[in-house]
């Protein structure tokens, strides 16, 4: 699941699918994908912004992005 989340996030952030708001859209999609799979991204607004910029500027490999997403995600409690 985390590999799919990373692929979605990286692709949306780097490939400029939209005229504007690619970084915000990529982050929102990552958060929604994680929530759909009962996980929550635990990053401050500044941390998530810095992380997304680092991805877009190709400062992180796929494996590094994956590791950061895993380390900053927590499973939601089951009902």
How would you label these PLM feature ranges?
Residues 1-11, 15-17:
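Helix-hairpin-helix/helix-loop-helix acidic hairpins
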Residues 8, 12, 32-33, 55, ...:
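Amphipathic alpha-helical segments in well-ordered regions
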């Amino acid at each position: 699941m985390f590999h799919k989340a990373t692929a979605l996030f990286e692709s949306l952030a780097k490939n400029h699918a939209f005229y504007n708001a690619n970084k915000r859209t990529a982050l929102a999609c990552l958060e929604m994908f994680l929530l759909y799979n009962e996980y929550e991204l635990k990053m401050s607004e500044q941390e998530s912004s810095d992380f997304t910029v680092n991805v877009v500027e190709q400062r992180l490999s796929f494996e590094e992005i994956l590791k950061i997403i895993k380390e900053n995600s927590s499973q939601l409690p089951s009902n």
